[in-house]
């Protein structure tokens, strides 16, 4: 998910949790 990729770049683990 492109949105999740942005979260991973900034939040790391939070991005994985928000993988939608």
Curated annotation (Swiss-Prot):
Limits of the Pentraxin (PTX) domain: 1-20
Which UniProt key words apply to this protein? Acute phase, Calcium, Disulfide bond, Glycoprotein, Secreted
> Post-translational modification, briefly?
Glycosylated.
Going by the entry's taxonomy, the superkingdom of the source organism is recorded as: Eukaryota
Q: Where in the cell is it found?
A: Secreted
Q: Which GO terms describe its biological process?
A: acute-phase response
| Cellular-component GO terms for this entry | extracellular region
Q: How does it assemble?
A: Homodimer; disulfide-linked. It is not known if it assembles into a pentraxin (or pentaxin) structure. Pentraxins have a discoid arrangement of 5 non-covalently bound subunits.
Job of this protein: Displays several functions associated with host defense: it promotes agglutination, bacterial capsular swelling, phagocytosis, and complement fixation through its calcium-dependent binding to phosphorylcholine.
Regarding protein family, the annotation reads: Belongs to the pentraxin family.
Name the UniProt record assigns to this protein: C-reactive protein
């Amino acid at each position: 998910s492109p949105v999740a990729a942005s979260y991973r770049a900034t939040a790391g683990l939070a991005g994985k949790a928000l993988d939608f």
